[in-house]
């Protein structure tokens, strides 16, 4: 059983998937930082200097705090600012992945166009012999 597992893990597809997951997780952190540290502060400055992560609506009258962390301690909240930030993360990540896939597809198409045409394989010996016999008979 251990040998089967080792064979499964050593297959190329599994290793490629593992590398993809690790790189994807690291790339996700980069996108999170881009959105949280660069894009959202600019958007927040445009809309009055507020942090989007602190945009919320209290779902009960007991919630009267001004920060999301304090509001969550007081009761249920609808934290739409956090959702906006996460949705923006997703859109940026999806767009970057789209651009990467598009670039890879374009590269594959270009390589296929530039690939020289492979010469046709010679016919099998019996077919070549029959063709030669046919040609000799046609000349008579």
UniProtKB/Swiss-Prot annotation:
Keywords: Cell inner membrane, Cell membrane, Ion channel, Ion transport, Membrane, Transmembrane, Transmembrane helix, Transport. InterPro entries: Mechanosensitive_channel_CS, MS_channel, MSC/AndL, MscL_channel. It comes from the Bacteria. It is found in: Cell inner membrane. GO terms for cellular component: plasma membrane. Its main location: membrane. Homopentamer. Belongs to the MscL family. Channel that opens in response to stretch forces in the membrane lipid bilayer. May participate in the regulation of osmotic pressure changes within the cell. PANTHER family: LARGE-CONDUCTANCE MECHANOSENSITIVE CHANNEL, MECHANOSENSITIVE CHANNEL MSCL. This is Large-conductance mechanosensitive channel 2. The gene is mscL2.
């Amino acid at each position: 059983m251990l040998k089967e597992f080792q064979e499964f893990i050593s297959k190329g597809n599994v290793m490629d998937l593992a590398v993809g997951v690790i790189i994807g997780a690291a790339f996700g952190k980069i996108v999170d930082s881009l959105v949280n540290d660069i894009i959202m502060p600019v958007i927040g400055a445009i809309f009055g200097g507020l942090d989007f992560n602190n945009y919320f609506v209290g779902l009960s009258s007991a919630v009267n705090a001004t920060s999301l962390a304090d509001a969550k301690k007081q009761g249920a909240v609808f934290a739409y600012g956090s959702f906006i930030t996460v949705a923006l993360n997703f859109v940026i990540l999806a767009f970057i992945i789209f651009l990467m896939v598009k670039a890879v597809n374009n590269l594959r198409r270009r390589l296929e166009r530039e690939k020289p045409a492979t010469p046709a394989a010679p016919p099998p010996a019996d077919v070549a012999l029959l063709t030669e016999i046919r040609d000799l008979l046609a000349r008579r």
